[in-house]
Amino acid sequence: MGSFSIWHWLVVLAIVVLVFGTKKLRNLGSDLGGAVRGFKEGMKGAEEENTQPPPSHQQVTGHSIKSEIEEKDQTKV
């Protein structure tokens, strides 16, 4: 009485198929698979957010001192 044999599980499966039908079982399986996939993508997104370095607060300009000096020299000529 402690464990079920393969025949017990086959009878239970047959009753479930008769009660719910194969279409509902297929929809249930695809819904469950979609939920698992969404959960995995959500966890992947959370891991990517944690691994990205925080943005720096320094503002970097595109000009260097050398280019500013060259611009001043060109305006003098």
UniProtKB/Swiss-Prot annotation:
Coarse class of the protein's main subcellular location: membrane
UniProt keyword annotation of Cell inner membrane present: yes
Gene3D superfamilies: 1.20.5.3310
UniProt-listed Pfam families: TatA_B_E (PF02416)
Entry-linked InterPro entries: TatA/B/E (IPR003369), TatA/E (IPR006312)
Cellular localisation: Cell inner membrane
GO cellular component, one term: TAT protein transport complex
UniProt keyword terms in alphabetical order: Cell inner membrane, Cell membrane, Membrane, Protein transport, Translocation, Transmembrane, Transmembrane helix, Transport
Name listed for the protein in its UniProt record: Sec-independent protein translocase protein TatA
Organism ancestry: Bacteria, Pseudomonadati, Pseudomonadota, Betaproteobacteria, Nitrosomonadales
